[in-house]
Structure formats: structure tokens, C-alpha cells
């Protein structure tokens, strides 16, 4: 149980059901371990300092978690074992369908050779004129004008 979890829930050792399952706590470590084994440039230095019991549980050839530790996982839900290296996408070769050109029938302005902005999206701005006068004299003049305007109507 993590230290953070113990601080937020005191006496959590009495309530084992509140402890998050092992499968939810080890996903990041699992990803780091798998990357360090299958990508040549990835060192995985974070994996070496991890808890040895978790690392041994994630090692290839062994099951990651039991059904008791991870209630979400069932026996038939994982068709390929986690340690199988054949399931990884090879970084050196790209899938041909990912590199196919866009066959969409609509043409954008850039594809049509138009480089200037669309005038429909121009922004109209107007200089802001403050409603508060800057000096006392202009304030008194504005007040006189406002009073005269109100008196007319």
C-alpha cells in the first residue's frame, strides 16, 4: 500500500477493500519494462529501481496479476500474453495503410494553391474609447453636456 494512500485513509490496513488492486498500480511499471525490453534506444532506468516483487510479477513468462488482485481482468479477456514480443508494432516498418495518401474528394484552399487568408474570417476591430474622462475639466464639461442632453428630452 502506498504511503500516500495510508495518509489519506487512516487505518486502511483494516479495510483491505479500499486498497487499489495491484493491476491498477503497476500499469506504468509494466509499460516501462516492456519498452525497455523491446525498444533498442530506451534504457528503462526507472524500471531497475522499482520494487523487485512487482518486477518479478511482471517478468515475461509469468502472469502479471491474479484474478484476486485484479477483479476487472478475466481469464479469457487477454488473447495474447503480455510478455509476447510478437504483439508489438515494429518501429522500423510502417503499416502501408497508414502511409496511403488522402483520397478525400474535398480540396482545401492550401491544396488548391490559395495561400492568402480567407476574407470571410477577417476580424473587425474598433479602437476602444474610455467612458471615464481623463481630467477634471473634461469631466465637468462632459457632465454639462449630459445634463443639457437630458434636459432637452
From Swiss-Prot:
Main location, first listed in the record: mitochondrion
One cellular component (GO) term of this entry: mitochondrion
Record's keyword annotation contains Mitochondrion: yes
Subcellular location per the Swiss-Prot or TrEMBL entry: Mitochondrion
Keywords, comma-separated and alphabetical: Mitochondrion
Protein name (record): Uncharacterized mitochondrial protein AtMg00010
Source organism (scientific name): Arabidopsis thaliana
Amino acid at each position: 500500500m502506498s504511503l500516500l494512500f495510508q495518509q489519506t485513509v487512516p487505518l486502511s490496513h483494516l479495510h483491505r477493500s479500499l486498497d487499489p488492486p495491484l493491476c491498477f498500480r503497476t500499469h506504468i511499471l509494466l509499460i516501462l519494462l516492456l519498452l525497455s525490453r523491446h525498444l533498442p534506444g530506451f534504457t528503462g532506468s526507472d524500471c531497475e529501481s522499482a520494487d523487485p516483487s512487482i518486477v518479478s510479477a511482471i517478468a515475461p513468462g509469468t502472469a502479471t496479476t491474479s484474478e484476486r488482485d485484479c477483479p476487472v481482468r478475466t481469464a479469457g479477456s487477454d488473447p495474447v500474453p503480455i510478455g509476447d514480443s510478437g504483439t508489438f508494432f515494429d518501429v522500423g516498418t510502417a503499416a502501408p495503410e497508414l502511409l496511403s495518401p488522402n483520397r478525400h474528394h474535398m480540396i482545401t484552399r492550401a491544396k488548391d494553391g490559395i495561400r492568402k487568408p480567407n476574407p470571410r474570417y477577417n476580424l473587425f476591430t474598433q479602437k476602444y474609447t474610455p467612458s471615464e474622462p481623463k481630467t477634471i475639466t473634461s469631466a465637468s464639461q462632459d457632465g454639462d453636456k449630459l445634463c443639457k442632453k437630458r434636459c432637452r428630452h
